[in-house]
């Protein structure tokens, strides 16, 4: 059985020691590349996004994340989403790879909302429509037989509000 490893440093995936391109790497050309324009901004946004994702996963697993004032608004937004939609997640931040196309990624959430199969990508910054559509399509390939009926970007804001944008499949 092949071994997929995810390395947070550099956001890299390897399959039996061979680096695989990620969904994010493949789709990044579809949006403004703020990473090259403002590297310091990219590092700050990436750290914040990782912290928010980790804290949201803790909430999904019934754990209480540490209170960090920098991300508390984002968590408040996620808690509001959970209360409003009461999702039943089947997958949470699970690194996966496609054995045929040899790419990897970590879909944020997939499961059920109101009896419908959904795939959700959590965002803490600007949502670039074309990039998110491509990213969700890549994640849909990775989750295989789940076949979501709806795909969403869930934008969490530091003000404590969320926006759920539906993307065509």
Where are the regions that the model predicts?
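Nucleic-acid nuclease catalytic cores
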Residues: 94-169
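Metal-dependent nuclease catalytic cores that hydrolyze phosphodiester bonds in DNA/RNA
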Residues: 1-104
């Amino acid at each position: 059985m092949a071994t997929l490893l995810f390395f947070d440093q550099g956001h890299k995936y390897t399959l039996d020691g061979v680096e695989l391109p990620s969904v994010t790497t493949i789709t990044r050309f579809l949006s403004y590349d703020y990473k090259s324009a403002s590297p310091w901004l990219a590092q700050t946004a990436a750290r914040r996004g990782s912290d928010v994702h980790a804290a949201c996963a803790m909430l999904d697993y019934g754990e209480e994340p540490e209170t960090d004032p920098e991300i508390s608004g984002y968590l408040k937004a996620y808690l509001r989403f959970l209360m409003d939609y009461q999702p039943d997640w089947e997958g949470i931040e699970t690194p996966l790879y496609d054995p045929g196309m040899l790419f990897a990624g970590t879909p944020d959430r997939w499961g059920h909302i109101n009896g419908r199969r959904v795939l959700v990508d959590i965002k803490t910054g600007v949502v670039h429509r074309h990039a998110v559509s491509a990213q969700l399509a890549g994640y849909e390939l990775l989750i295989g037989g789940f076949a979501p009926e709806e795909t969403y970007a869930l934008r969490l804001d530091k003000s404590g509000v969320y926006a759920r944008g539906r993307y065509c499949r």
